[in-house]
Regions:
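Extended, low-polarity transmembrane helix blocks
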Residues: 1-34, 45-60, 66-124
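Interfacial loop at the N-terminal end of multi-pass membrane proteins
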Residues: 38-44
């Protein structure tokens, strides 16, 4: 399952990152229509198709990282998804309301930190 050279801390890191994405994917699936409509309202063409790929990236990437099977490739999927989420959903640069801008910036910063954790998985 895990490479023999992984420490316990590295395994825990893998599992925590994977849990975040798998959990969010599984909780988003039942609300597919709602999420697809939100993407469409933001001007994303073929929103259902885009959402399907996004959920697939989260699930495949998360499972890949969790079981350490091609974890580097799964990590790339998770980074691409997270970067897209920052651009589409947490675009603080386009927000005029100061409270909303601060909320989006906070979430974008958290997502940037998650990308940092994923990069550490790639480096293993």
């Amino acid at each position: 399952m895990f490479h023999s050279d992984h420490t316990t801390i590295q395994i825990i890191g893998h599992l925590l990152i994977a849990f975040l994405f798998i959990y969010r994917c599984l909780t988003a699936m039942p609300r597919f229509a709602e999420h697809s409509s939100r993407l469409a309202s933001r001007g994303i063409p073929f929103s259902g198709f885009v959402l399907t790929f996004g959920l697939g990236f989260m699930l495949v990437g998360g499972v890949s990282v969790a079981i350490d099977y091609y974890a580097q490739y799964g990590s790339v999927l998770l980074i691409l998804f997270t970067m897209a989420a920052i651009y589409v959903h947490h675009n603080f640069w386009d927000t005029t309301d100061p409270m909303e801008k601060n909320r989006k910036l906070y979430i974008a910063c958290n997502n940037t930190a998650v990308i940092g954790g994923i990069l550490l998985i790639i480096s293993l």
